[in-house]
Amino acid sequence: MAIRGIGVDIVHIPRIEASLAKWGDRFRRKIFTEREITAAKDRLREARFLAMRFAAKEAFTKATGMGMRSPLKWHAIEVKSDDLGRPEIALSEDLKKWCESRNIRYWHLSLSDDHDHAVAIVILEGE
């Protein structure tokens, strides 16, 4: 396997808090999937939870070198947790096919937060 891309993003959590306060569900629905929104609302610190997912989506687009343009769309990238609570990325079928056409077979995600910041790193692998 070879590394096909690396992306990193850092988000100032108060920026997400401000967007939630100003735009509410409009902001949530523009950026996040229904599952992400539902999972966030079950949490005490919704903005922190969503900031980490926002950072993950941005890091993924940076790893591809494309930025946020078709087929990379906010809802095409979903951050969820596996059975052990480890974050992982689920892609839409269109985006998965796009990745496969560019020999990207695996994607790895790490998330962290500290005080007012959330950070994500994404590593893309292929042959």
PLM regions: where:
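Core catalytic alpha/beta fold that binds nucleotide/phospho-ligands
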Residues: 1-127
